[in-house]
Amino acid sequence: MAKNKYSEPDYWSKKAFAENYPARSVYKLEEMNKKFNLFSPNDKVLDLGAAPGSWTVYVLRFLNKEGRVTAVDLKPLDSSVYDERLNFFQGDMFDKGIIKSVKELGPYDAVICDAAPATTGNKTVDTARSSGLVELALYYAQEQLKQGGSFVVKIFQGGDQQIHLNNLRKCFKTARAFKPEACRSSSFETYLIGLDFKG
């Protein structure tokens, strides 16, 4: 049976292990934050699709003691991800109870979402599912971001990327697509970024 090339450790996964992050995806967020100044040290940040927790850990390390993170995922966070400034809700992002609980801890300075659908290998199906997650993440952002806030969401290329980007431009003063260096060259994922939420 052929090996899954994604299971082979690469530069980024080795770096994540050495720096005590649960996954290599952290370096995508790090690059985007350095380039676009997504966060300030005392921010309240909502992390959707947070498991295993690399983005959560990165944000917690970036924030000061006044900062807070609310994280949501169907799966549990890695056992190493714990902090008094973290509130984690394990459940479906579509669930009304989850939406209510998240809203009670807001509003937020940034909404970030690295969620990906369960893939089928059918690009049409996978991009459609990814598009649904983008719509949900943008709903959270529109409902719970403070004016001037930031937004980042993963999207699979080849679907409704331009439609979503146009929707972001209605809500944010700046909106663009960006593919971090830490994305695998064979991956068709990229990120949509919204800056300075109009409110």
UniProtKB/Swiss-Prot annotation:
<dbReference type="GO" id="GO:0005737">
    <property type="term" value="C:cytoplasm"/>
</dbReference>
<comment type="function">
    <text>Specifically methylates the uridine in position 2552 of 23S rRNA at the 2'-O position of the ribose in the fully assembled 50S ribosomal subunit.</text>
</comment>
<feature type="binding site">
    <location>
        <position position="55"/>
    </location>
    <ligand>
        <name>S-adenosyl-L-methionine</name>
    </ligand>
</feature>
<dbReference type="GO" id="GO:0008650">
    <property type="term" value="F:rRNA (uridine-2'-O-)-methyltransferase activity"/>
</dbReference>
<dbReference type="InterPro" id="IPR050082">
    <property type="entry name" value="RNA_methyltr_RlmE"/>
</dbReference>
<dbReference type="InterPro" id="IPR002877">
    <property type="entry name" value="RNA_MeTrfase_FtsJ_dom"/>
</dbReference>
<keyword id="KW-0949">S-adenosyl-L-methionine</keyword>
<dbReference type="InterPro" id="IPR029063">
    <property type="entry name" value="SAM-dependent_MTases_sf"/>
</dbReference>
<comment type="similarity">
    <text>Belongs to the class I-like SAM-binding methyltransferase superfamily. RNA methyltransferase RlmE family.</text>
</comment>
<keyword id="KW-0963">Cytoplasm</keyword>
<feature type="binding site">
    <location>
        <position position="53"/>
    </location>
    <ligand>
        <name>S-adenosyl-L-methionine</name>
    </ligand>
</feature>
<dbReference type="InterPro" id="IPR015507">
    <property type="entry name" value="rRNA-MeTfrase_E"/>
</dbReference>
<feature type="active site" description="Proton acceptor">
    <location>
        <position position="154"/>
    </location>
</feature>
<feature type="binding site">
    <location>
        <position position="73"/>
    </location>
    <ligand>
        <name>S-adenosyl-L-methionine</name>
    </ligand>
</feature>
<keyword id="KW-0808">Transferase</keyword>
<feature type="binding site">
    <location>
        <position position="114"/>
    </location>
    <ligand>
        <name>S-adenosyl-L-methionine</name>
    </ligand>
</feature>
<dbReference type="Pfam" id="PF01728">
    <property type="entry name" value="FtsJ"/>
</dbReference>
<keyword id="KW-0698">rRNA processing</keyword>
<keyword id="KW-0489">Methyltransferase</keyword>
<feature type="binding site">
    <location>
        <position position="92"/>
    </location>
    <ligand>
        <name>S-adenosyl-L-methionine</name>
    </ligand>
</feature>
<protein>
    <recommendedName>
        <fullName>Ribosomal RNA large subunit methyltransferase E</fullName>
        <ecNumber>2.1.1.166</ecNumber>
    </recommendedName>
</protein>
